[in-house]
């Protein structure tokens, strides 16, 4: 369980850092939620996987994995495509 928690936490932190480094106008150009909204969602995902894990347990870890997964699978490729960067 600890290995899974660390994997979800690393994924959430990676998604948060990636979202923070992108241009704000790329989110609207890709027709996705705005940058501040994604930073709040992914910040909450990091909190769920780290600070709030003792309170929410596996439910918090699952919500964190879902939020990070949606960003990495749906939003990130569109942002890279809009900005002309490779994957």
From Swiss-Prot:
One of its GO terms (cellular component) is membrane. It is found in: Membrane. To M.leprae ML2453. This is Uncharacterized protein Mb0486. Residues 1-19 form the signal peptide. Its main location: membrane. Keywords: Membrane, Signal, Transmembrane, Transmembrane helix. It holds the Pfam family DUF2516. InterPro entries: DUF2516 (IPR019662). The chain crosses the membrane at residues 39-59. It is a single-pass membrane protein.
